[in-house]
Structures are given as structure tokens and as C-alpha cells.
């Protein structure tokens, strides 16, 4: 089974080796045909502390690192 990969924006980078990434999902409601934006925040592991707030990053599923961290930063474009 392939690992999930999401693209998002770093919203919080204050903790050591941990960042909060906000991922946008856009979908259309089947009944009302309205476009809906849904944001979800993921806690991701940043090994090198290289990410800053506002950076675009790719996160990938990983085995649990801590209670809430189950994602790892794969690629960050500054």
C-alpha cells in the first residue's frame, strides 16, 4: 500500500524538530454543487529544523514518531 503524500503550508514552527502543516482540500458538494475548502492540520517531523512559517512542504506518512506525529517532511521549497 503506497504512503500518502500531501502538499501544505507550515503554520507553526516553534517546537524542536516539529512543525504544524496546514493542508487544503478543495471539493465540490454533490447535492448543491458548491465548491468547499477544507483545511486540516498535521503535525510533522522536521529533522533538520529547516522549515519556517509560510514554507510550502510535502509531507509523507510515516510510522508513529510520537503520540501525534505520524508524518515526515519529504521536500521543502522555500
Swiss-Prot record:
Q: Which SUPFAM superfamilies match?
A: Nucleic acid-binding proteins (SSF50249)
One Gene Ontology term from the biological process aspect of the record: translation
Residue ranges annotated as transmembrane are none
Task: List keywords of the entry alphabetically.
Answer: Ribonucleoprotein, Ribosomal protein, RNA-binding, rRNA-binding
Task: Cite the GO molecular-function annotations of the record.
Answer: rRNA binding; structural constituent of ribosome
- Does the entry feature the keyword Ribonucleoprotein, yes or no? yes
Keyword RNA-binding recorded: yes
Q: Which family does it belong to?
A: Belongs to the universal ribosomal protein uS17 family.
Q: What does this protein do?
A: One of the primary rRNA binding proteins, it binds specifically to the 5'-end of 16S ribosomal RNA.
PANTHER family tied to this protein: 40S RIBOSOMAL PROTEIN S11 FAMILY MEMBER, SMALL RIBOSOMAL SUBUNIT PROTEIN US17M
> How is the quaternary structure described?
Part of the 30S ribosomal subunit.
Q: Spell out the protein name for this chain.
A: Small ribosomal subunit protein uS17
Naturally occurring in which organism (per UniProt): Wolbachia sp. subsp. Drosophila simulans (strain wRi)
Amino acid at each position: 500500500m503506497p504512503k500518502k503524500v500531501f502538499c501544505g503550508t507550515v503554520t507553526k514552527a516553534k517546537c524542536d524538530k516539529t512543525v504544524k502543516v496546514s493542508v487544503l482540500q478543495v471539493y465540490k458538494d454533490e447535492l448543491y454543487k458548491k465548491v468547499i475548502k477544507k483545511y486540516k492540520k498535521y503535525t510533522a517531523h522536521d529533522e533538520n529544523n529547516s522549515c519556517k512559517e509560510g514554507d510550502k512542504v510535502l509531507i509523507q506518512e510515516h510510522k508513529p514518531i510520537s503520540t501525534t506525529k505520524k508524518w515526515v517532511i519529504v521536500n521543502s521549497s522555500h
